[in-house]
Amino acid sequence: MRTETASLLLLAALSVAEELTPNDVPLACANMCGPIVELSYKCDVDGTDELRKLKRRKLFSPQQQQQQQQQQQQSAPKAKRQADPEPQAPAPVPSSTNNQQAADVIFIPGSIGKFKTIPTPLPPADTGVPSMAVTPAAPAPTLPVLDLRPTTTPTNLNPNLPILATPILPSVPASTPLATASSTQVPLPVGNEADAGDGVDAGPAPSNSLNGNVGDMVDDAGNLWPGQKGRQAASDLETACICSNTSFNVRRVAGLCGDCLEQVSGDQGPMRAILASCNFTTERYEPEKESLVANVRVEATKPSFTQTAAASYSWRVSGPTWAVVVGAGMLLGMGW
């Protein structure tokens, strides 16, 4: 039977890992990893208020889930029987395989199922009377085609007007002094660029880099930027809250939880970051060892973040702590 503490652990993980589904978390490790999930959420810098709101929510018990599945299975056959019958296909129009009969029968538009038979004309009988020869009519005479194209070159009717002709221009020499002078390139000063418009010196080209990569987290002296300092301070507070908690045996529970995940899913997943941050080691998990967390009540105080770095802290959770909080939610958040 699950205790009230176990339900509280699941509710805390739901608010952290909303994108997870029940199939993402192994059910066998739910009880052992529960206290770590709750502790990770309570040590979050600004996430305890949501945990208080989730306490009033209730989960479906296994018996209620089984009854709901049975009701869905019973209602499925009824819905199938009440479905509309499939429409019947229209009867095919009879067709004849005989080419002669198909040519003699035609369909009358506007009448359904009515056909009209046209008698096939029979060839004329041979009576022995010679047939009269038909003389083709003489073709109509064709009119001559007039050719209106001029046969001679047009001449100048007015001798006083000169005939306009395109004068032949003399060829330009291949190289001229002007072309030679314009093709000469003017040397530019080294390190400067000339403007293509007025030829004024444009000065040195701007650099695309600003003290190295733009995404660097440190300045030239190796110090963290103001925003990174706030995130690092929050991460240190949350790590100390988790690793130094004394409400239960955090070291042993975390080690058993990590080994349980290793046995069930083959990988510790996000629990690896928790063990590495706190310098914990794994312990061989066995179902009998779940009695260690049977009556555990997690107590933790949310770290106070009132340092000067709080003014520049714009992230909800820093990088390492995000792995701790969300990773712990992935362990049990949706598996019950």
Curated annotation (Swiss-Prot):
Residue numbers spanned by region Disordered: 59-99, 189-230
Stated role: Effector that binds transcription regulators in the host plant to suppress the host's innate immune response. Inhibits the host plant transcription regulators CBP60G and SARD1.
MF GO annotations: transcription regulator inhibitor activity
Signal peptide positions on this chain: 1-19
This protein's name: Effector SCP41
GO biological process, one term: effector-mediated suppression of host innate immune response
One GO cellular component term: extracellular region
